[in-house]
Amino acid sequence: MESPPTCRKTSCRMKKASPVSRSGRFSSGPGEDAAKFTESISFDRRLWRHDLMGSIAHATMLGGIGVLTKAEAKRIVRALEAIGDDIEAGRFDWDESLEDVHMNLEAELTRREPAGAKLHTGRSRNDQVALDTRMWLRDEIVDLEEELRSLQQALVVLAQANDDVIIPGYTHLQRAQPVYFAHHLLAYVEMVERDRERLLDAFSRVNVCPLGSGALA
């Protein structure tokens, strides 16, 4: 049986120089329309803080089990923290050609610290995306829940300040009976409370670590 031809061209090697994901099998970059269609950095850059936190934890773990040396792990963590400082200060240049927040941060990390190329050991990109999304959602739920509690407190204060005010209660677009304005406001407090309970339930579902699941688990 004839052996399959061996590709000797640099562009055919699986090892790629480009930091763009999935670029190893292609000799040139995507067309402009394809690049615009597949990029997500325009909206997923909001995950940068959680992506860095996950990478810092992963680097620390790799250093702990000996995949990275202690010195490498420390240098990677320092580089990730410095990248976070630059983003916070508005000094980070997001590159749309790198497609998403993960590749942007990974490219900058390996530029600053060559040992950063080892960081993805034992971690699927799918793990990383799921982790970032869950951490971001967790923070958003906490913030929204706090805002709802503030709204409830404001409604209670307003109800207490108007405990003797009477307003018409409507049914079928007609005035049906007199009701206390305070009772009307407190009804909304209870409605918001049910929304808070739903958020807290969502938090318990989101607050699960997906690391180690890989692409297909």
Predicted stretch roles:
Residues E2-T6:
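Cationic, amphipathic, low-complexity segments that mediate targeting or membrane/lipid association
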Residues K15-A217:
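A helix-coil-helix interface module used to build multimeric assemblies
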